Every structure is written in C-alpha cells, then in structure tokens.
Amino acid sequence: MDEEGSATARAKMMPQTLVLDHVSPATRLLEKRRQMFEVQEALEAQKQDFNRKEEVFKRREEALKLKDLELQESLIRFSKFLQENDSKRARAEKKANDEIKARIQKEKEIEQLTEVLEELKSEKERILEVLEKNMRYQHYLESVLEVADEYQEVADLLLRHATLSATNADLKDHQRKCSELAEKVRTELQIYVKQKTDEILNLNNQVAKLKTELEGYEAEAMVQEAKKDSSLQIASQRTLEYGQVVLSADNIFNRCRSKSSIGHPAESNPLHQLDVIGNFVSDLGSIIKQFKQEQAKRASLASRAEIE
C-alpha cells in the first residue's frame, strides 16, 4: 500500500506535458519554463519524500536488528530452558520454530525494504537526470523572453497560452457538435431512404401481383372469348342445318302433298310436315309391299299354268 501510494504521489507531482505543436515560440518558452518550475517542485517533493522514507527504513532496520538480538537471546534462554526441563521440550520446539519463521519473515522484509531503498535511489538519480535535461528548456525560455518585445513576463506568455487553449477547446467543441449533428442527419437520411426503399419494394410487389392477376384475367377472357366464338359457330352451324332441314321438309312435304290422293292443307310447321311425310312414306311402303306380294302371287299362278 505504501509503494502504491508513493507511486501515485510521484505521478501526481510530475509536470503535465502540453502539446507544443503549432504554437508560437513565446508560448513554447512559457510552457517550458512552467514545466521547469513543476519539475523543480516535483524533485524537491520527491527529495523530501525520499528522506522521509529513508529515515523510516532506518528506524525499521534498527528495530529489526533489536528484534533479532532479542530473538537470539530468547533462543539462548530457550535452549537453557530445554536443558532444565525436558517435559516442556515439545512446546518449546514449536515456539522456537515459530520464532525462527518470524525471524526469517523479518529478514525477508528487510531484504524487500532494502530493494525498495535501492529503487528509490535509482528513481532519485533518474529524476536528477531528467532535471538536468529539462534545464535547457529553462535556458530557452529565458532566451525567448530576452528577444521577445510583446511579452516581457512569463505570466503574459501563460495568459496568452491559456487564451489560445480556451479558443482551441471551443473550436473542438463546435467541431464535435457539428459532427454529431451531421451524423444525426446522416442517420435520419439513411432511415428515410430505407423506409422509401421498402415502400417502393412493396409497391413493386403489389404491381407485380396485380400484373399477374391481370394476365390471369386476360387469359381467362381469351378462353371465354374462344368459347363464345365456338358456341356462336356451333349455333350458326346448327341454325344452318335447321334451315336446311326445314327447307328439305317443306320440299318433301309439297311433293308428298302433290302426289297424295288425300287433300292435305298447307302446313308451315315442320313437325306437322314431318308427320305428313311420315304417313305418306308409310303408306307408300305398304303399297309397294302389297304390290310385290301380288306380283309374286301372279308369278306363282303363271308358273303353275305353264306346268299344267
């Protein structure tokens, strides 16, 4: 916990480096001088922290040495006690082992603290090296102040830098808001385009469906038209046949009426005409049959007469 706290404190005490790109030499000089002041303050704080920790480590080391001496004396007394009383040897050995473990643990702590001390010494040397490197920035800032007519004090440079930083922050915030607005408009445009694309797709599907239905209706209409034409053709054929039958029936009726000995009145109904024709044909058939029978009878009589 002490090491983590020290590291955090060191991180907080380190100077914050600003980006010096695209700024004037006077601003860079001011920034470098500010960094130099912060480095010096951080180094001084680390020196004080290092001295304080070194003193704490020394006190701990002395305390551990005293504890080690006390432990050795306790071991000596414990050995004498074992020689005087064997019945308590088991318990004494356990206590001795515990004390040995504690001594070993303390020795490990001493080693760890020694390593921390060495690390702090190395950190001190590194900070001194950084401080020595940063001194050139201090000299540079001083040289800039010597040649700059506009800024005579470091505070003026700091104020100018703060103004430029605030302006830069405002411009970045404005740019961010414009980017957010553009992204919002772009998103809304994408949503609108998607909605209209979906609507167009649905309308195209409906048009395709209606077109398919129209083609079906047209095909059905063509079928019905073909049926109608066929029906009209059949009706015309039948009408023609009916007219031919009526004319034939009327012609035959007139011929039968002219040859019949019965005075049939004139008929225009084809059915009545067919009845008359049927009767006439039936009578004619009977007459022909009777005539043939009489001829056969006569022929038979003639044959008999010749034989006799």
Curated annotation (Swiss-Prot):
Cellular-component GO terms for this entry: axonemal doublet microtubule; motile cilium
This entry's Gene Ontology molecular function terms read: dynein complex binding
One GO biological process term: cell motility
Principal localisation? cytoplasm
Pfam families attached to this UniProt entry: DUF4200 (PF13863)
What UniProt keywords apply to this chain's record, in alphabetical order?
Cell projection, Cilium, Coiled coil, Cytoplasm, Cytoskeleton, Flagellum
**Residues forming coiled coils:** 103-134, 164-227
Describe the outcome of a gene knockout.
Answer: The mia2 mutants do not express the protein in the axoneme and display slightly jerky, slow swimming phenotypes, reduced flagellar beat frequencies and defective phototaxis.
- Tell me where in or outside the cell this protein is found: Cytoplasm, Cytoskeleton, Flagellum axoneme
Q: What does this protein do?
A: As part of MIA, a complex associated with the outer doublet microtubules of the axoneme, may play a role in ciliary/flagellar motility by regulating the assembly and the activity of inner dynein arm.
Outline the subunit composition.
Interacts with FAP100; form the modifier of inner arm (MIA) complex.
Family label: Belongs to the CFAP73 family.
According to UniProt, the name of this protein is Cilia- and flagella-associated protein 73
What is the source species? Chlamydomonas reinhardtii
